[in-house]
């Protein structure tokens, strides 16, 4: 298994998430990245392993290794007998692969209350559908030998160094009480991110992905806060740390009394400027709401709504928490993008 390199630049720990963010010199002669057909949906975003890109001798290659207490041991399953009683009443969840470098686009996966309707590897009918990678030939000594329902194909050659991507990556669960489907990342492999359609409330230790860059959001005062600096609204202070392929930035601190609106993007007018070719000039906007707290929007938000504009490549939120699946939800895992549709059986 690949060890953490000595050039680790930062470790961020919380009760929910622990990540090692590593900046390494890239090999300019080694370009293993296949051409992306649509960078808005496919970033070369591999948490466990990321090939070096052809950028130059002074460039950096961002690699994120993370562990989380998120796993599949505490995901409740439901008996087949109970699920059989509601399967004809529940919506069908249709998941379409809308962009992929390793799987057929437009391929649709259908899930009902029992699980995958066709092609499940587990055939458990317990209301759970696990997506991930498995070591079918038992070559590697991995901790996770559990089966998955759907294998996420990858163009990567699995070696001892990157074998930690083997396992269950995310789970879709049907809840018999709410009659809804839920999705959650399981802390293995590449990370599962949902595309922010309108807005999202920022919570402590949230991880965001924009372009080839990652943003970690925390609240309050930490060891990076400038010594002697006045701390207005201390608990409401938003700390933002940006990690990108080029370099990591110094922490940014924002409090609601001084900042009505925060812009992040490539433009020099932004409060946080990131040198990332996949970002829009103003890629996302963060505002403070007295009731909801800090809120992030994709694209530019302006007092004049006619000037509002979505980003080209989207703003993505890591699914560290289980969320309900709504019709039209777009999420990604590895270099694959998926769109969810809910089909109402009872609709006439």
Question: Which functions belong to the PLM regions below?
Answer:
Residues 1-115, 213-281, 287-292, 334-348:
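Regulatory inter-domain linker segments that are low-complexity and enriched
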Residues 117-205, 210-211, 255-335:
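Forkhead-associated
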């Amino acid at each position: 298994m690949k060890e953490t390199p000595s050039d680790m630049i930062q470790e961020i720990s919380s009760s929910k998430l622990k990540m090692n963010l590593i900046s390494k010199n890239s090999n300019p002669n080694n370009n293993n990245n296949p051409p992306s057909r649509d960078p808005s949906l496919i970033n070369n975003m591999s948490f466990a392993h990321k090939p070096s890109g052809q950028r130059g001798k002074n460039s950096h290659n961002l690699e994120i290794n993370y562990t989380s207490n998120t796993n599949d041991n505490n995901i409740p399953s439901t008996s087949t007998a109970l699920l059989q009683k509601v399967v004809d009443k529940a919506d069908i969840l249709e998941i379409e692969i809308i962009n992929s470098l390793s799987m057929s686009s437009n391929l649709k996966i259908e899930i009902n209350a029992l699980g995958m309707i066709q092609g499940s590897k587990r055939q458990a009918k317990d209301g759970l559908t696990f997506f991930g990678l498995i070591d079918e030939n038992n070559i590697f000594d991995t901790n996770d030998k559990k089966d998955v329902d759907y294998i996420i194909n990858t163009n990567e050659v699995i070696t001892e160094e990157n074998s930690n991507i083997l396992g269950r990556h995310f789970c879709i669960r049907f809840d018999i009480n709410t009659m809804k489907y839920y999705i959650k990342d399981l802390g293995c492999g590449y990370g599962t991110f949902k595309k922010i359609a309108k807005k999202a409330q920022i919570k402590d230790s949230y991880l965001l992905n924009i372009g080839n860059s990652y943003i970690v959001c925390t609240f309050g005062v930490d060891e990076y806060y400038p010594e002697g600096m006045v701390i207005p609204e201390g608990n409401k202070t938003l700390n933002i740390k940006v990690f990108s392929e080029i370099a990591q930035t110094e922490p940014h601190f924002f409090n609601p009394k001084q900042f009505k609106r925060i812009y992040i993007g490539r433009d020099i007018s932004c409060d946080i400027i990131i040198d990332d070719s996949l970002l829009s000039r103003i890629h996302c906007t963060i505002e403070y709401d007295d009731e909801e707290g800090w809120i992030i929007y994709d694209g530019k938000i302006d007092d004049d709504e006619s000037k509002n504009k979505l980003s080209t490549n989207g703003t993505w939120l890591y699914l560290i928490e289980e969320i309900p699946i709504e019709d039209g939800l777009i999420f990604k895992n590895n270099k694959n993008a998926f769109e969810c549709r809910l089909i109402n059986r009872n609709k006439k």
